Each structure stands twice: as C-alpha cells, then as structure tokens.
Amino acid sequence: MANYFNTLNLRQQLAQLGKCRFMGRDEFADGASYLQGKKVVIVGCGAQGLNQGLNMRDSGLDISYALRKEAIAEKRASWRKATENGFKVGTYEELIPQADLVVNLTPDKQHSDVVHTVQPLMKDGAALGYSHGFNIVEVGEQIRKDITVVMVAPKCPGTEVREEYKRGFGVPTLIAVHPENDPKGEGMAIAKAWAAATGGHRAGVLESSFVAEVKSDLMGEQTILCGMLQAGSLLCFDKLVEEGTDPAYAEKLIQFGWETITEALKQGGITLMMDRLSNPAKLRAYALSEQLKEIMAPLFQKHMDDIISGEFSSGMMADWANDDKKLLTWREETGKTAFETAPQYEGKIGEQEYFDKGVLMIAMVKAGVELAFETMVDSGIIEESAYYESLHELPLIANTIARKRLYEMNVVISDTAEYGNYLFSYACVPLLKPFMAELQPGDLGKAIPEGAVDNAQLRDLNEAIRSHAIEQVGKKLRGYMTDMKRIAVAG
C-alpha cells in the first residue's frame, strides 16, 4: 500500500491540508437522529472506545462491541469493560455483518489487521469510522468502494470525552469524510450524527479532512504537546539540581509546574499565562522565548517536513515491524532519567510560586506553542486546526505528567505520539544544552526581583503577545468552550 497523501498531486495535497471550516451550531439541529435505529458496532474498548460508546448509547444509539474471540474467551480487559457497562459483546463474525456503522477505535498499529478482518464481513453500503486518520493517510489503506469512510476525532482523551458529556457539554471535535469513499453522499450526515452523539457539537466542530487531521495531529504531539514537555522536564530538572536545588523540590516544581502554567493557558491563552508574571519576569520570559524560537525553529520544521513527506511514518512503521525495538528502548531509557527517579517532595508549593520560579518553563511553553502553530500554518494547515493541535491539548498532556511524571504521559498517549515524542526530545535536549548553560539567576528556581520597567517596552511586548495569530484564533475558539471544567491543579 502507498502513502495516500503522496499519491495526490500538489493541488490536491494543498486542498486537503487546508480544509477546515468551523461549523455552526444550527448544522447539528438534528442531533444524532441520522444514526438512530441503525446498528453501530465499535471495535476496540480502550479509553476512546468505551467512552465514546457510553456517550453514543446515552444519546439513543444502538451500540455493541466486536472483540476478538480470544478476548472474549479469556475475558480480557476489553471484554470486562464492555460487559460491566451493560453493552452487547460479540465476535467480529457475529456483529460486523449486521452493522450499519463500524467504528474502529483500536490503536493505530492494529488498524490494518482490524480493517483487513472486518472489511470482508461488512455488508454492502455500510460505513467505516475512525477517530484518527493514520491508517487511511499514512498506511494508505484501500477501502471497498461501496463503503463510506468517515472520521470523528475528539480533541481530548477518552475520559474527558465522557466527563464533559456527563456535565451536559462536550469536547472540541474534528470531523471528515474520506473523498475516495463517499458513494452515497451520506458521509457528512453520518459524521455529524456521530459527533453529536458524543457531545462534540456543544463545544465546537471543525469540518476537516483526513489529511489535515493526521498531519496536524502528528506535528502537535511530536513537538509542543509531548516532545517539548519531555525535553523541558529533563533539561529543567538537571539545571535545578546542578545549581544546588533539592532534587525532590526540583522534581515537584517541574512535575506540577507544567499543569499549573498551562491551566492559565487553557483559560486565556498565552496572554493570560504571561500576565501571571510580574512585569520584569514577563519581559525576561518573552526574551527567553524569542531565543528558544530561533534555536528550535529548524527542529520544528524538520519534524513537519518529515510528517508531510511520510518519512516519519515509514520510520515508525519499520519499528512496528521490528517489534517496537526503538520505542521500547527509548521508553526504558526515559524511565531511568534523574527526573523520573527523583524522590517525592512532601511540602507544599503555592500556585503563584510555580509561575514566579518557572519563568523558563513559561518561555518554553510560549516558544513551543507558537512554533508548532506557525510551522503548521506555513505548511498549509488552517489556523483553527493548528490551534487545536498545539495550544488546546497542552493542558491535558501536562495533567498526565502531574499524575505520574513522564511515565504517565507516555502510557496515556498513543504509541504513535510516544514514538514521535522520543524523536523530538532526543534531538531537542542536546540542541538546548548550550542555551541552558547561559541562563541567568531568576530564570528557573528563583523569582526575579521586582523592579522598574520601561513602559513603552512593556506596552509593545503586551501588544506583540496579544496580536499573535494563535491568540486571535484562540480567543474565538475558546468562546465555544467556556463551560469546560477547570482541570484540577495539584499542590
């Protein structure tokens, strides 16, 4: 199979990369009615599989789970989760032939095997759904021409998808129809009904493409969302300890610092995050972020180039074929780092202390978010898509680090995200070491003293922060998410 994106001509590539339309709430007036009375069979009962299924059932849809015979016979976790929640469970052979919509919510590396198994069992004119388009775009999976292929991609982990639905809300969602597989022209109606059934229409839905979702998703998770947080954690911890900070305190400042800092980012973008600093600290954070952007821009661009060309995907799929040798080696090495093995700090760190003593961390967040956004937009991805794949998801990933450090982040994210994270962080750490050696007192671990600032300089800096394109589009998109619950900040 050939990488689908690479089979397109340049005009088609640009058209699909640039497909992005914010859908009006009136477009979802019919809710999930298009799928009511039809049989929806979900393959996979992980975090997305279970929680999307729960939401869809609560929205009045007929939901069941198709699992492998061994999973049922051995009563594995997927079988237990589905049955304990009262769902009908059966084998592929029992459930797939009667399904109107088959939703493949297994991990990326299982998609080809799953599709090859279910496709011969699917009835004529059925639909196949994904929540990530890697199998279609990067693997180049060929789907029978009578089958409609759609995507509904919530921009949150599965647990958040469920929690927001239970609150009567939802999470921002991308939907798409594969242009090669919409024989009856009903793909958009199916995708809209599925998105409404998960609650996504209450938080904002982007009509996108499989290509735009995949390329932007890979870029965000590799760079700012996971790679930058991992590289930043390792670099900042080592710097603090090198300068005499208690390792336990240093570990806590970083582990919970990302979460605290990005909570401000979630509520009010880079503007609010920077406003949490004193004026002298804000000036310094801005200067550091500009230095970081200049240093890291070529690395961000390389990742985007490798994602666009398919170089990243081919390398990762080669590792899949080699029993994940690289991935597992990198995972083991990360677990042995000083940050991951540091003792726990039992004392309290106040919320403002994370900002005052984390000026460098704030600069890293600002630089990483802006670079990821700018690099995606320069590659033809529309600003709304770039926002969701950079700034929007960052607090959610930071929250995983607050739970169990980098280990938890790498467990929760997909194997695809984890592989890309290691590629980025392994390149970024040595790249930034000379920069780290030139830091000043107050950049990390100590507060910058209050002092006089130049009013004109501060005015211009504030204007530069607020006028960045990600702040402009972010203000609009956050307006649709005002009801989303505040992520709990650990102390």
Curated annotation (Swiss-Prot):
Residues annotated to bind Mg(2+) 2: 217, 389, 393
Matches recorded under InterPro entries: 6-PGluconate_DH-like_C_sf, 6PGD_dom2, KARI, KARI_C, KARI_N, NAD(P)-bd_dom_sf
Cofactor: Mg(2+)
Alphabetized GO MF terms: ketol-acid reductoisomerase activity; magnesium ion binding
Domain KARI N-terminal Rossmann: 15-208
Biological process according to GO: isoleucine biosynthetic process; L-valine biosynthetic process
Keyword Transmembrane appears in the UniProt entry: no
Active-site residues from the entry: 132
One Pfam entry name: KARI_N
Protein keywords: Amino-acid biosynthesis, Branched-chain amino acid biosynthesis, Magnesium, Metal-binding, NADP, Oxidoreductase, Repeat
Keyword Amino-acid biosynthesis attributed: yes
Signal peptide as annotated in the record: none
Sequence positions that bind Mg(2+) 1: 217, 221
Domain KARI C-terminal knotted: from-to ranges: 209-344, 345-484
Binding site for NADP(+): 45-48, 68, 76, 78, 108-110, 158
Pathway noted in the entry: Amino-acid biosynthesis; L-isoleucine biosynthesis; L-isoleucine from 2-oxobutanoate: step 2/4; Amino-acid biosynthesis; L-valine biosynthesis; L-valine from pyruvate: step 2/4
Cellular component GO terms held in the UniProt record: cytosol
HAMAP family: IlvC
Function field: Involved in the biosynthesis of branched-chain amino acids (BCAA). Catalyzes an alkyl-migration followed by a ketol-acid reduction of (S)-2-acetolactate (S2AL) to yield (R)-2,3-dihydroxy-isovalerate. In the isomerase reaction, S2AL is rearranged via a Mg-dependent methyl migration to produce 3-hydroxy-3-methyl-2-ketobutyrate (HMKB). In the reductase reaction, this 2-ketoacid undergoes a metal-dependent reduction by NADPH to yield (R)-2,3-dihydroxy-isovalerate.
UniProt family annotation: Belongs to the ketol-acid reductoisomerase family.
Protein name per the record: Ketol-acid reductoisomerase (NADP(+))
Species name: Escherichia coli O157:H7
